[in-house]
């Protein structure tokens, strides 16, 4: 897959009536920390809480050594392309704000060449 490949995904905030979701298109080679920024912008949030993307049992975020435990893998060092290829997943989880636990389901709808 080339750098010109685009991923269409739907992100849905779980357990919130009415359904709140966004459909987004991003480059396949986007870093996961930048994908987090896209999610923040799409939902008009302020990026003021911890977050994690989980692909099965593998979590990515911004590690914080002050917590004193093994945290998520560094999202600044992983791309969506790498993680999707490694995990062979079409869905993943996005958790924003560990206190309020805003959980999201993300579904990859389509992967296409950029037009």
Segment roles from a protein language model:
Residues 1-115:
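Short linear regulatory motifs enriched in tryptophan with gly/pro/ser
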């Amino acid at each position: 897959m080339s750098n010109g490949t685009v991923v269409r995904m739907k992100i849905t905030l779980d357990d919130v009536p009415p359904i709140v979701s966004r459909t987004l298109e991003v480059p396949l080679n986007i870093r996961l920390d930048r994908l987090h920024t896209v999610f923040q912008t799409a939902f008009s949030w302020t990026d003021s809480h911890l977050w994690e993307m989980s692909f099965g049992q593998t979590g990515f975020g911004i590690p914080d050594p002050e917590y004193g435990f093994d945290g998520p893998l560094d999202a600044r060092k992983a791309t969506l392309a790498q993680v999707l290829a490694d995990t062979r997943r079409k869905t993943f989880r996005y958790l924003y704000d560990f206190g309020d636990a805003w959980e999201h389901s993300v579904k990859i709808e389509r992967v296409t060449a950029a037009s």
